[in-house]
Structure formats: structure tokens, C-alpha cells
Amino acid sequence: HNLDVLQGGATLEDVKVVGGDVRYGIYSLISEVSCNDGNCLKKEDLEKVAAETDPAELGAPEWALDAINKRGNDPKRIEGLIAPGQYVLDPNMEAKDILKDLITRSTKRYNETNIEERAQAIGLSPYELLTSASLVEREAPAGEFDKVARVILNRLDEPMRLEFDSTVNYGLEDVELATTDEARGEKTPWNTYAKEGLPDTPIASPSDDAIKAMEQP
């Protein structure tokens, strides 16, 4: 059962674009490939595990634990911690074991790339680097990653608000390509129109390319 989930920019939850398609999220994709004789893991079971299991037990990196725990019981709190890539899943595994497997492998990948030193070199924590790279993924049409990375670093430096539509949409059920003034004014943990600095968590799974763009914009 191949979980070829993950492209950079994948999100945990499904995204409904107003008047358009649904972009299926990681939870839905896992549910789909976990089916065994008609038994599938439910998306809700995966969400419950993500929201309620100690992130350290799921294999989350040490440098992300504080930020994850601050989000309380939000099933989106592990956003960005499943790295893009191809995974082979055992359909007999429980929801907890599947998430643990995916997150543990991703943590290993992130740590093997020296993410802590790389983040430090540009004045960010590893978690902030992941978060910034996720913005690069969601904001950069057609991979203009460097441009967005420069904007992020310049605005954080100023400091001025990032004001990215992707961070407004991340808090909404139904996504509009152009965000409304009302949505921009609403305080959420992610909305960079209404808050200073970066969102509280990544808003997608960042690819290696997006992370590299943050390092060398």
C-alpha cells in the first residue's frame, strides 16, 4: 500500500476551494490507502490520535514539541511534520502506529539534513524554518520559491507583518483564492494579517526545495 502522498504543500486536512475542487489532505490519503478487506482507518481516528497523543510518542522532533503542545488538542498541530515523499504503509497498522511511523521517518530526515544548524544560520529556530518553508510552498505559484523566501526574511527582519493570504485560508473551512477583508481581520493562530511574525505552526508539508529557498533566497 503505497502512500505516494506527499508533494510539497500537502496539508493534513482536506481543502475545499469555493466553486472548485477538493484538495485531499494527508489524513484522507492515509485513510484511502489503509483499506484492508473493506476496513479502512477513519480520518477521524487519525485526527484523534494527532490531537490527543503526546507528540514525543509520535516521534515528533524535540525542537517542535513545545509549539505542538501549545496548540492543545488541535488535530492540525502536527502539520508540517510529515515530510513530502513516498511511504509504504502497512494496512494492518493502527492509526497511532501509522502516524508514528510517518512522523518518525520524517523527523529522521529533517534531522539528517542538519536542520538545527541550517536554521540557526539564518536566525530562525528549526520549527520556524519549517513554518517559513511551508509558507513558501503555499504562496509560490509555479515554484517561485526564492522570491517568497526573500519577502519572508525581509519582513521578519523589518519587522512588519507578513500578510499572506495562504495563512488566512489555512484557518478556513472553505478557501477563496482572494481572501475577504473580514477573514483577514480575524485572529487565528495562523493569520499573518492579524498577528506579528510567523504562523504558530507550519501550514503545509514543506519540500526540501522550499527549505533550501529559505536558506539561500
Region spans (language model):
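Glycine-rich loop/hinge motif
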Residues: 2-38, 48-49, 79, 118-125
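Short, glycine-/polar-rich solvent-exposed loops and beta-turns at beta-strand/coil boundaries
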Residues: 43-46
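Residues forming well-ordered secondary-structure scaffolds
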Residues: 10, 21-25, 41, 82, ...
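Bacterial extracytoplasmic/cell-wall-associated proteins, especially those involved in peptidoglycan
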Residues: 31-36, 52-217
